[in-house]
Amino acid sequence: MSYKMSRAAYANMFGPTVGDKVRLADTELFIEVEKDFTTYGEEVKFGGGKVIRDGMGQSQVSREGGAVDTVITNALIVDHWGIVKADIGLKDGRIAAIGKAGNPDTQPGVNIIVGPGTEAIAGEGKIVTAGGMDSHIHFICPQQIEEALMSGLTCMLGGGTGPAHGTLATTCTPGPWHIARMIEAADAFPMNLAFAGKGNASLPGALVEMVLGGATSLKLHEDWGTTPGAIDCCLSVADEYDVQVMIHTDTLNESGFVEDTIAAIKGRTIHAFHTEGAGGGHAPDIIKICGQPNVIPSSTNPTRPYTQNTLAEHLDMLMVCHHLSPSIPEDIAFAESRIRKETIAAEDILHDIGAFSIISSDSQAMGRVGEVAIRTWQTADKMKRQRGRLKEETGDNDNFRVRRYVAKYTINPAIAHGLSHEIGSLEVGKRADLVIWNPAFFGVKPDMVLLGGTIAAAPMGDPNASIPTPQPVHYRPMFGAYGRSRTNSSVTFVSQASLDAGLAGRLGVAKELVAVQNTRGGIGKASMIHNSLTPHIEVDPETYEVRADGVLLTCEPATVLPMAQRYFLF
C-alpha cells in the first residue's frame, strides 16, 4: 500500500513538484514547476536513513560501467527551455543526463546511475541554473573574476590588459602580444575566459594578426574611432575568420549618424553594446538599431532597471571612465548627450517585450561585474509590477518572463559569441558550469558554483569550526579553484584560426583552448531565444521619446527595488 504525503510535506522532503510555485528572492516573480522527472515513491535523497545507500538507491555499478561522477538530486531547473524538477547527472565535467537518478537494479525508470564512485549534491528545495555569461568585460583588474564567480558567472568575455587607460574605457586587448599575455594569465583563474581584440582599423592586416593571436572577437569602440571604414573593414575580417564583432558607436556623430552606421554594417551580424546609448553610441537615437534583424542588442547593467537614482550616478561615472574633464565644457556636453531618461525608460520595456536580447556588466567601466544577475531580475520584477503579466504566459505564474530574462545572461550571449556548443544552458553534453541557489537568495547570493563539474566557489563558515556553518560565513574559493583542478575545470576560448595556426603549442598554457564557432551569417537577432523581436523604433530628436511600431515606450523610475539592501546588511 502506497504512502500518501501532503504537498507541504513532500516539498519539505523532496522539493516542489508539478503545480507547486516558488517565489524568486523577494521579487514578485513566481515560477511553477512544469514537469517532474521523478517516479513518485522512488525519489533518491542523500543522508542518514535516506535512499542513496548501498543496495538501495546506490548501485554496484562502477564509473566505467556507467555510473555518474556527481548527482544533483531533486533540483528545480530554471533555463530558457523550461522550469522542471529533475535529478542531474554529471560526468567528465559535463552534463551527462537530466532525469531520474538511482539504482537500476532496484528502481524503475532510472537514466542516471548512482554508484560507489558517485558524489551527491542535495538539490532538494534548490534552484539550478546554467552559469551566467558576461559578454561585456573590461579586464581592468584580475580581482573582478572572483567577484563575478561568487555572483554566479562562469564565463567572462571582453578585452583589456589591466588598468591601462585604453582598457579603462574600451573592451579591447590590442595586438597579439597583449592577447598572448592575457591567455597565459587565464590559467590562474577558475573561470571560462575569452578575449576581444581591437577592431578599429581601416586595413585588415592588424586585425587578422589579432584573430590569429587568439582573439575570439573584435571590438569597435568610438574612443578608437568607429568610422564607417573601420566598421566595414572589421566586419570583413570577422566574416572571413568566424569571430563576432561588438560595436560602441560614435556618440558625437562625427563620422556619421546611426543611419550611416547601419549602412556600413551592410546587413552583417554584429553585437551592439549598450544599445540604449547611456554607455555610448549615436546620440540620441542609437536605440533604433535594435530593430535591425542582423543586430544583436544588449544592455550594460548601470541602466538596469530605470530608477530614481539612475541619471544622477551616470554623469560622474562617465567622466571617469572615458577620461573626460569636468573643467572642459565640450567634455561635459559629450557626457550629458549620452544620458537620457526617455531612452533608459524605453530600454526597460524593450527588454520586457524581447527586443533587447542580452544583459552584461561593463565591469568597472560604467558597470558592476557582480550584479549581472541581480540587475536582470530587478528589471524583470519592475516590469511585472508596472506592466503586469506578459501575453505569452500560459498559467498563473511568471514562467515565460523568467525564461525570457534568464536567457539574457546565459544562452543568448553564448549564441552571440559562438560558445553555445559548450556553455549557456543546462543541456546534456554541455559543460557542467552550474549555479545552485536557495530560492530566497535567487539571483543574489549562490549556494554553490560549479565549473566543469567541480565545486569552484561557495559560502563557507569558520574553517576551524566543528561544522561548516558557524559564522563568519562568506564566499570562499573551493577545490575547483586550485592547482590543476582549476585549469582542468575551465577553458579559454579562442578563434579556430588561431588553433589552426598552432597557438596552443606556441603558448603552452595549461587550460584547454576551445574554438568559437558560428558567429557570423548563421546567427542574427532571430537566434536570440525569447528575445528576438525587431520592432520599428523611432526617436524624437527634440524630446527623445521612443516609439516601437508607433507605440510610445515610457515608464516611471523605480523608487524601491528587490534584491537590494535586504540582502546586503553586512
From Swiss-Prot:
EC class name: hydrolase
The answer to whether the entry has keyword Lipid metabolism is no
The protein's UniProt keywords, in alphabetical order, are: Cytoplasm, Hydrolase, Metal-binding, Nickel
Q: What is its EC number?
A: 3.5.1.5
Does the keyword GTP-binding belong to this entry?
Answer: no
Pathway the protein takes part in:
Nitrogen metabolism; urea degradation; CO(2) and NH(3) from urea (urease route): step 1/1
In its record, the post-translational modification comment is: Carboxylation allows a single lysine to coordinate two nickel ions.
Pfam families for the chain: Amidohydro_1 (PF01979), Urease_alpha (PF00449)
Protein family: Belongs to the metallo-dependent hydrolases superfamily. Urease alpha subunit family.
Q: What is this protein called?
A: Urease subunit alpha
Q: Which gene holds the coding sequence for this protein?
A: ureC
